[in-house]
């Protein structure tokens, strides 16, 4: 057991949860429990993803899965980042409502971090929950080859579960010998995206974890895949949805099946069954069931009269619908090829937002925003997908309150940073534009983003 793992065991005990995360927590650079200072690198590495074979990957701190960053709601976290890749990169803190200068989007919020350079990210997360971090440059390659990790923001007042497990879902573009296949094939980019063929949870294919009989278990599920939407189901216990995209819901409900698009997260909770029984986490495809991972329950002295502890709500600004301004966003398909760049490479454009394909940006060229919003005002985004493929629509720096899905008004609106639009789907998502800056707004199917389905909004 390495030092970082020992440190996390101590920290987990102090927080009242079992140290059950799949990867060691990132080692803090300070021994003070109320300070969160970390060192993080992006670098080439080797990983055993397909058993018996080694794969060249890109890893945070050379690790697959990446180390989990843990911090606390309302307390400052500092991450000293160094780029050891052979190309520029940045880190985006997905789902966190933090200042624009820390958002990790090249040219829009910071200069690219060049090979060999370092950059310090420093922010105070206002929300607790399950979030993740990834580059926002050459995303098809950098995310596809492994630069994805979790950042878990603990509640300001600790919420005590007996056990906690984090599950990062990803399909890798590998053959049977662990060698890379194409990360992006244009004919698939124009449809659902290019799917990987080797499915993993925390870098392992169909892993098994142990849980204690009668334990209250919190499972933090994160879809860090470039392409695939996972319809999630749990067998063997009654599981309850307690948070969506890091945001607790007021009234937990029993899980039957829940779709998690790329970039999205789902927190579920359950009581571990009797020793010897198993809990199965499944990916559902119609009538077909695909295993993701399983939990084996072991003997324990834990009492059997447990209940799921409630989560406090995050401090999301209440929307003022009576004075909200509505803005329509239509996501559609239109195949085209942009002019070749200086290297002679032609980049396809397949997707449009309000008739515009993302044209890219540089230090000398920032396109016009998709919309200009007034600071402090409530907006309703009317989202409409007029294509045959799913689009998880993600807004940086803000949290949506979803009011309507596919024409149906929700009795209980929920908070999220990513709205999954299905085939010909629609949604009404409201939010208060309370975070000034220029914020990326895009589909989180990475190839869709790469081939046009991206832009930004400006809040001022």
Predicted regions, residues:
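N-terminal export signals
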Residues: 1, 7-27
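Extended terminal and domain-junction accessory segments
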Residues: 11, 26-39, 143-175, 250-390, ...
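C-terminal segment of N-terminal export signals and the immediately downstream linker at the start
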Residues: 23-56
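N-terminal edge beta-strand
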Residues: 54-70, 197-207, 350-375
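Extracytoplasmic beta-sandwich strand-turn segments characteristic of Greek-key/jelly-roll folds
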Residues: 64, 69, 95-127, 204-205, ...
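Hydrophobic or amphipathic alpha-helical targeting/insertion segments
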Residues: 125-154
């Amino acid at each position: 057991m390495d030092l970082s793992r020992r440190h996390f065991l101590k920290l987990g005990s102090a927080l009242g949860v079992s140290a059950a995360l799949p990867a060691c927590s990132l080692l803090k650079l300070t021994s003070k429990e109320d300070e969160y200072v970390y060192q993080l690198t992006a670098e080439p590495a080797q990983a055993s993803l397909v058993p018996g074979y080694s794969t060249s990957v890109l890893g945070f701190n050379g690790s697959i899965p990446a180390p989990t960053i843990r911090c606390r709601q309302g307390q400052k976290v500092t991450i000293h980042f160094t780029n050891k890749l052979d190309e520029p990169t940045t880190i985006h803190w997905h789902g966190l409502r933090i200042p624009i200068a820390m958002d990790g989007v090249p040219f829009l919020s910071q200069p690219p971090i060049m090979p060999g350079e370092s950059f310090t990210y420093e922010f105070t997360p206002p929300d607790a929950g399950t979030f993740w971090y990834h580059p926002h440059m050459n995303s098809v390659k950098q995310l596809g080859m492994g630069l994805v990790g979790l950042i878990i923001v603990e509640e300001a007042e600790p919420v005590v579960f007996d056990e906690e497990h984090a599950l990062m879902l990803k399909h890798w573009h590998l053959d049977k010998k662990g060698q890379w296949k194409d990360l992006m094939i244009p004919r698939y980019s124009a449809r659902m995206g290019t799917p990987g063929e080797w499915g993993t949870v925390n870098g392992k294919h169909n892993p098994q974890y142990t849980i204690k009989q009668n334990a209250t278990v919190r499972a933090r599920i994160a879809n860090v895949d470039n392409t695939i939407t996972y319809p999630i189901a749990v067998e063997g216990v009654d599981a309850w949805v307690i948070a969506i995209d890091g945001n607790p819901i007021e009234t937990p409900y029993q899980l039957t099946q829940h779709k998690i698009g790329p970039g999205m997260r789902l927190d579920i909770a359950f009581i571990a069954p009797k020793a010897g029984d198993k809990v199965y986490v499944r990916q559902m495809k119609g009538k077909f069931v695909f295993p993701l991972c399983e939990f084996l329950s072991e003997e324990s002295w834990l009492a059997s009269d447990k209940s799921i502890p409630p989560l406090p709500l995050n401090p999301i600004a209440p929307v003022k619908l009576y004075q909200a301004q509505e803005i329509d966003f239509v996501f559609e398909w239109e195949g085209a090829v942009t002019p070749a760049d200086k290297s002679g490479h032609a980049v396809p454009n397949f997707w449009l937002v309000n008739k515009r394909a993302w044209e890219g940006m540089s230090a000398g060229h920032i396109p016009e925003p998709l919309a200009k919003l007034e600071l402090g005002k409530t907006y309703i985004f009317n989202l409409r997908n007029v294509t045959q493929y799913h689009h998880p629509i993600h807004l940086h720096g803000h949290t949506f309150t979803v009011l309507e899905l596919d024409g149906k008004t929700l009795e209980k609106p929920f908070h999220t940073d990513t709205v999954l639009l299905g085939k010909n789907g629609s949604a009404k998502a409201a939010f208060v534009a309370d975070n000034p800056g220029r914020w990326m707004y895009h589909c989180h199917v990475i190839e869709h983003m790469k081939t046009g389905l991206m832009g930004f909004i400006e809040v001022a």
